[in-house]
Curated annotation (Swiss-Prot):
Gene3D superfamilies linked: Helix hairpin bin (1.10.287.540), Vaccinia Virus protein VP39 (3.40.50.150)
Keyword presence, ATP-binding: no
Pfam families, A to Z: AviRa
Keywords of the record: Antibiotic resistance, Methyltransferase, S-adenosyl-L-methionine, Transferase
Function: Specifically methylates the guanine-2535 in 23S ribosomal RNA. Confers resistance to antibiotic avilamycin, an orthosomycin antibiotic.
Enzyme Commission number(s) of this protein: 2.1.1.209
Protein name, UniProt field: 23S rRNA (guanine(2535)-N(1))-methyltransferase
Record's catalysed reaction(s): guanosine(2535) in 23S rRNA + S-adenosyl-L-methionine = N(1)-methylguanosine(2535) in 23S rRNA + S-adenosyl-L-homocysteine + H(+)
Top-level enzyme category: transferase
InterPro entries (UniProt xref): AviRa, SAM-dependent_MTases_sf
């Protein structure tokens, strides 16, 4: 793909706020929409070819990140895959990823309209209108986006390979667990980021780009060569290629 500089389209993300159309729950934070689209487009620019890609979030939590990218970048996507070691948030992720179809957005619009009539709150009607706008956009951009939801420990290469059976993600984009609201689970190695990268790379095609974000000044990936780094607000991000991770060794 052609070289990417930075996102120039200003995105009105109000329709994508947690709890408006997308489902939310305590303990599952949202992700900055502009940063999500910035990182995704940078990853696309690092791939060979120009066709639609498969996107995977192996620490998906509520599925918010994948759902937002699916709604904003339908034309660039072939499929999205969501996985997490904890099955608890996957129910919420399934509800959000169901919004990546016109039927799912229609159902959400009707739900919000019914709530507006029942409770007499303008905010519910506004949410219904947001669902309609998102449905119109998704339909115009290609319609329903295929999704898969699985349970897997991101530090278990065999489990990840099983999750991806029949699929070959081109882009991995995930927000690393942090602080008190989310945290690492599963068989966590002494160096979580390095372990995560090796585990992911072992299950990916060589050309795949792995993008991870964290609330830290700099995400450590050495000795792996970073394709690029960026920092927006409180989050840092780094992009690496699967082949480079494997070449760097354990």
């Amino acid at each position: 793909m052609s070289a990417y500089r930075h996102a120039v389209e200003r995105i009105d993300s109000s329709d994508l706020a947690c709890g408006v159309v997308l489902h939310s729950a305590p303990g599952y934070p949202a992700f900055p929409v502009r940063l999500a689209t910035e990182i995704f487009q940078r990853a696309l620019a690092r791939l060979p070819g120009d066709g639609p890609v498969t996107l995977w979030d192996p620490c998906c939590g509520s599925g918010y990140l994948l759902t937002v990218l699916g709604l904003l970048h339908r034309r660039s996507l072939r499929q999205v895959i969501a996985s997490d070691v904890d099955p608890a948030p996957l129910e919420l992720a399934a509800k959000n990823l169901a919004l990546l179809s016109p039927a799912g957005l229609t159902a959400r619009e009707l739900e919000r309209r019914e709530q507006s009539e029942r409770f007499g709150k303008p905010s519910y009607l506004e949410a219904a209108q947001a669902a309609r706008r998102l449905r119109e956009r998704l339909t115009a951009e290609g319609g329903a986006l295929p999704c898969a939801i699985r349970t897997a420990d991101v530090f278990d290469p065999r489990a990840l390979s099983a999750v991806l059976a029949g699929s070959a993600p081109d882009v991995v984009l995930t927000d690393l667990p942090y602080g008190e609201r989310t945290h690492w689970e599963g068989q966590v190695p002494a160096q979580p980021v390095a372990g995560l990268l090796r585990s992911l790379a072992s299950a990916l095609p060589a050309h795949a780009v792995i993008a991870v974000t964290d609330r830290s000044r700099k995400i450590p990936v050495a000795p792996v060569k970073a394709l690029e780094r960026l920092k927006i607000g409180t989050r840092s991000a780094v992009l690496v290629r699967a082949a480079d991770v494997l070449e760097a060794g354990p």
